[in-house]
């Protein structure tokens, strides 16, 4: 008879991302986006989807020397439960227009609901994520790594280092 651990996440797989790995993968995303903008290869601005997209957006904007950076705040998760996506804060309307020349960056596309909402607002923006799951993949234009739908990604900003008991216990 198995008992369910109430403290265990409902996801079957966990993928732990370190700060070093998100930095490397975000730089790889920048390299993939370099020269792909509509203005002789250049991008006008970067818009980070908060909060997860902020670290990758900072790295991409640095690597591509893009000085204009804004945010869009979309809430679609409460802890690990996904809900209805809603915009809490939109970027500057004058900057955005229809999204032409704008890189919208997030850490992950999961179901695609967040990107779908933002894409409706800015249909000509280029959507880039570091990681992508199969359900959300059609919503993203560029990504670095695909993971299975049942994988839960643990980002470094959500983690803390702590002592863990040895597997076999202690004396």
UniProtKB/Swiss-Prot annotation:
For binding Mg(2+), which residues are annotated in this chain's numbering? 107
Q: EC number(s) per UniProt?
A: 2.4.2.-, 2.4.2.22
GO cellular component, alphabetical, reads: plasma membrane
Q: Does the keyword Chloroplast apply?
A: no
SUPFAM superfamilies listed in its UniProt record: PRTase-like (SSF53271)
Cysteine pairs bridged by disulfides in the record: none
- One Pfam family, short name: Pribosyltran
Give me the residues that bind guanine, please.
110, 153
Q: Which enzyme class, named as a word?
A: transferase
Sorted UniProt keywords: Cell inner membrane, Cell membrane, Glycosyltransferase, Magnesium, Membrane, Metal-binding, Purine salvage, Transferase
Broad class of the protein's primary localization: membrane
One of the GO BP terms on file: purine ribonucleoside salvage
What positions does the entry give for 5-phospho-alpha-D-ribose 1-diphosphate binding? 51-52, 106-114
Keyword Transit peptide applies: no
Q: Which residues bind xanthine?
A: 110, 153
Tell me which residues bind GMP. Answer: 110-114, 152-153
Q: Which reaction does it catalyse?
A: GMP + diphosphate = guanine + 5-phospho-alpha-D-ribose 1-diphosphate; XMP + diphosphate = xanthine + 5-phospho-alpha-D-ribose 1-diphosphate; IMP + diphosphate = hypoxanthine + 5-phospho-alpha-D-ribose 1-diphosphate
Cross-referenced InterPro entries: PRibTrfase_dom, PRTase-like, Xanthine_Guanine_PRibTrfase
Q: Which domain of life is it from?
A: Bacteria
Job description of the protein: Purine salvage pathway enzyme that catalyzes the transfer of the ribosyl-5-phosphate group from 5-phospho-alpha-D-ribose 1-diphosphate (PRPP) to the N9 position of the 6-oxopurines guanine and xanthine to form the corresponding ribonucleotides GMP (guanosine 5'-monophosphate) and XMP (xanthosine 5'-monophosphate), with the release of PPi. To a lesser extent, also acts on hypoxanthine.
Similarity-based family = Belongs to the purine/pyrimidine phosphoribosyltransferase family. XGPT subfamily.
The subunit structure is: Homotetramer.
Query: What name appears for this protein in its UniProt entry?
Result: Xanthine-guanine phosphoribosyltransferase
């Amino acid at each position: 008879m198995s008992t369910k651990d109430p403290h265990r996440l409902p996801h079957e797989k966990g993928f732990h991302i370190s700060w070093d790995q998100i930095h490397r993968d975000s730089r790889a995303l920048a390299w993939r986006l370099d020269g792909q903008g509509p203005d002789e290869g250049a991008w006008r601005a970067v818009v980070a989807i908060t909060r997860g997209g902020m670290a990758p957006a900072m790295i991409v904007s640095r690597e591509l020397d893009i000085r204009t950076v804004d945010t869009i705040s979309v809430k679609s998760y409460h802890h690990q439960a996904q809900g209805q996506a809603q915009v809490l804060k939109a970027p500057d309307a004058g900057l955005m227009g229809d999204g032409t020349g704008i890189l919208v960056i997030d850490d992950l596309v999961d179901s695609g609901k967040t990107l779908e909402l933002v894409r409706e607002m800015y249909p000509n923006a280029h959507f880039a994520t570091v990681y992508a799951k199969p359900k959300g993949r059609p919503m993203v234009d560029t990504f670095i790594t695909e993971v299975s739908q049942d994988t839960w990604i643990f980002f470094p900003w959500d983690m803390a280092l702590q002592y863990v008991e040895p597997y076999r216990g202690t004396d």
